[in-house]
Amino acid sequence: MMNDNIATPFAKPLYVMLKPAGAHCNLACKYCYYLEKNHLYQNSHRHLMSDEMLEQFTREYIEAQTMPQVLFTWHGGEPLMRSIDFYKKALALQKKYANGKQIDNVIQTNGTLLTDEWCEFFAQNHWLVGISIDGPQEYHDHYRVTPAGKPSWEKVMQGISLLKKHRVEWNAMAVVNAYNAEHPLEFYHFFRDNGCQYLQFTPIVERLTEHEDGRTLASLADDREIPLAAASVTPQQWGNFLCTIFDDWVRHDVGKTFVEIFDCTLANWMGVLPGICAYSKECGHAGVMEHNGDVYSCDHFVFPEYKLGNIREQSLIDMLYGEKQQAFSRLKHTSLPRQCKECDMEFACHGECPKNRFEKDKYGEQGLNYLCQGYYQYYSHVAPYMDFMKRELLAQRPPANIMNVLKNN
């Protein structure tokens, strides 16, 4: 029986990111926030999701959905460390429990393990593949290396070639760090020139501490006066990076290359949901399930203090719509400091991701986003362009018209 203290499950779709191989990965990227999550499961040497766990999750996840479409997201670690047979079982279970719903799958991979066989599987089953790649070789190989310290870029590019060969739909997730942030146009043009139509930028902001179990990355529950990891992008770098790329994109690529943060900005300008939790008023809509059934509030909050429970003991609905997760969701908005509440750009960023809110604002209140200066620079810079594109959309004209206006001015 459903707990009476949970929010209505019909308010929004249930969304859970799966970790079928836990934090296991064939790379050892120097900035990775997830690799050390293995320390949370030191009593288990086999961080692989069992067939039993896979079936329980699949059945419950589909049954909990109130929408006609269901999205399965496979993440890591490196999810391709599981065999194709595992994912064939996953597809069979999805078909078994679909009950008339449309099932879609997306997988995020570093791309180094892709083969013809994998790509044939993705093509035949219409999977979307996200590739983690940090731009040109020099910038990618600076941080994204093997456990032996060897570069990985060439293997990733081979993987992308195989995806193209088999006509698999793919997009890119690129980490912006202290090194590659200094080269925004070269970075952006690399993706555009390689035929990547959908691009997500993820700024690295991590703080270092020491936990008894060996973990070194901090959560918001840790002491706030702790140092940043060396790879972390600075607010100034982040603002300059976004503005420089936007100026190129808005003149050449609107409607052709889709950059997630630009799409989210326009959505918030229009007053519609941006679809990405970081730029939404509230978050907590996307949980994470580890290999053993442990469920956490968010992929960036896989810490003991943000564990919601285990699927063997509690239902997904009880965990993800329960009071602990609802409080986590509301806190994104209710914990904004005074400076944010007074800001004319709050509607566009909503404070961004809570994991980055560890600074004090100009009034001395805790909770300002570390990247605030960069975001404000970006939103102020793009405001007139967003105003124009908003007017075009409201008039039922394509926002890409802005390119013609800029060309003629």
Regions found by a protein language model. Name each.
Residues 25, 29-32, 277, 283, ...:
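Disulfide-bonded cysteines in secreted/extracellular proteins and peptides
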Residues 2-120, 124-125:
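Conserved alpha-helical substructure of the radical SAM core
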Residues 302-409:
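Flexible mid-to-C-terminal extensions adjoining Fe-S/redox cofactors in radical SAM and related proteins
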Residues 146-154, 161, 165-278, 282, ...:
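Radical SAM enzyme [4Fe-4S]-AdoMet core and its adjacent flexible, acidic
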Residues 57-59, 63, 81-200, 207-209, ...:
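Conserved AdoMet/S-adenosylmethionine-binding subsite of the radical SAM
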Residues 291:
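A cytosolic small-molecule/anion-sensing beta-strand core signal
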Residues 30-34, 134, 213-220:
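Short, flexible, mixed-charge acidic loops at enzyme active sites
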